[in-house]
């Protein structure tokens, strides 16, 4: 009798486990759920759901944009710059042809320079950016960051005076430059 009771108990537990697992959520369901968490400003749950989406659907065509989004949430909402850097590094490693790689390289360098104060690592990533993406729209920003790497923002001349001028090579006259 004891043996039959054990068998019934095991079968019941297996059945309960199978029912509780339920069907796997679709990528659309997970994405909608993560967006909802973001709207509710529950950023840790949003990241967790985005990570589940990437783990469950690693070949989804938008997986690279999800990793970029995770990096942005860590950076902008949680101020967790180490994890932001890790998300951007993961994006570059997993998706070497992603359209987000240039932005991710920039963000890695930016966080090392401005959030973590590791100018050696910042320089490494900024130089890598310029080598790979010399014509990218962010290249001038990267060059500016490199030119002012390690400087206190309050000691940069044009920021103290509120004007940013560069010498015009042709005439020698100062040429206003857009700071945006």
Which residues make up each language-model segment?
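Sec-dependent signal peptide hydrophobic core
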Residues: 5-13
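Acidic, polar-rich low-complexity tracts and alpha-helical solenoid repeat scaffolds
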Residues: 2-5, 17-180
